[in-house]
Structure formats: structure tokens, C-alpha cells
Amino acid sequence: MTTLNILYEDPHILVCVKPHGIATQSKSIRYPDMVSLIKNHLAKASGTSGKSGAQKSCSSRTPGSTEPYLAVIHRLDQPVSGILVFAKTPAAAKDLNKQLQNQGFGKYYRALVTNAPASPKGTLENYMVKDARSNTSHICSAKENGAKIARLHYDTVSDNNWLFTAPSFRPYGNVKDANSQTSDSPEKPGVFQGTELEIHLDTGRHHQIRVQLASIGCPIVGDTKYNPALADTKNWQTIRLCAYKLDFKHPVTHKVMHFQLEADPL
């Protein structure tokens, strides 16, 4: 049973941490997603049973229904962990969506990559296109059908300021293959070595960070879609990518809200 990690809640918004492996919102009723978990939480808090556990993909109240209102403002890929904000009223959803469209959100990520980038700090700007059939994206030319601009800024994280500090993937420096494992124990400190990057998104394309970092030879540790070292891996891997910091203005009070994680929520 997944327990919600709620960072902040009031009558208008709810801010929580999405763990690795749980979808933000899914059409499947087989596994829980963040929307169903939060709706169950809201239903229990209000003392109503509602339909929060069964109707997971609905983000608006059905007339005559007791299901709590919840609007998805932004999403994280299912393998990725991090901070999400949800709206509990239509007015809050409208304001937050407007902020998101006008780049009013500060979305910051941490990624543990296999190789250090050529420059410790920089901007990546590419055109990307999504392949719905394979649920992947790739770098493309501006003329390709469906191409969209993708831009991010990255900076190498200094020593002792890491987010990824669990023993199995503690970064001890740059190595050629951060996915290599020792023969005696894959869980010992230092097995996964790499470079930790802080990333600030200007755009929010499908798999953007994963694709753009892989395109410069810096795939993310644990990324079975875009890390060549894991291309034949069939077992579940925990991707070392976390939306660790989020800034926005409260939709009602307009106060600047700041949330930050100190460690990756495994």
C-alpha cells in the first residue's frame, strides 16, 4: 500500500511527492496512480466514500457525484520521482495552468548521469518529436512533422550537495560506465558512480531531460529507454531522475510557494 507524502495542503491545492514507479494519472485500474491515491485521501478527509478508487482518470467532478475534485496541473514520467502540485478547485486549476503556460513555474530536477558533460554548465536546445507507438521521443530537425522546441539548462552539482546519496548510487566522481557493477555486491557504496546535474526546464516535452542528456553522451543511470548500457535490460531499474524543487505562486493568496527535497524519495 502506497502512503501519500504530502508536503502541503489547504482548501485550494495539494503538494505531494510522487515516488518512482507510480504514474501521475493512468487509465488502468490495476495499479494505483497519484490521482486515485489523492482522491481517496480527499474522500476520507471529507467523510465521503465517493468513487475515487474506481474512476481514476477523471480530473473534474461529475454532476451529482460525491467524487472529490482534483485537477492534474503537471506530470512526471512514471519511472521519475519528485514534487507535484494538484488543484482542489476549478479556480485554482485555472490559475495554476495559466502560470504553467506563462512559465510561472520553477521546475528543477536532479539527474545522476553516467558521464560528465563536456562543459560543466550549459544550455541544451533541440527539436524533439514523440513516437506514440513506442512511447519514446527523439531529437529531430525543425522540419520534421510534429517537431517541438525543447530547451533546458544544466549545472554540475558540487561535492557534498548531492540529492542521490543512497549507498547503491552515491556519486564518487566521473567514470566511463556508471552502470557497471562489481561481482561481489551491486549494493555496495560506489558501485554506481557518475556526475549529478541540476536541471531547469524551459519547456516540458515528453521524456525531454532523458532524451537531451542522452544525446550529448550523458544518459541517466537506470534509464532503460535511453541509456545504451541498459538497452537489453528487462528487469526494473530505478532511474536516477527526480523533480526535487518546485516554485509557483499560490493561486489564491499569490504568495510564492517553494518546495524542495533533500534526498531522492526511494
What are these regions (language model features)?
Residues 1-266:
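RNA pseudouridine synthases
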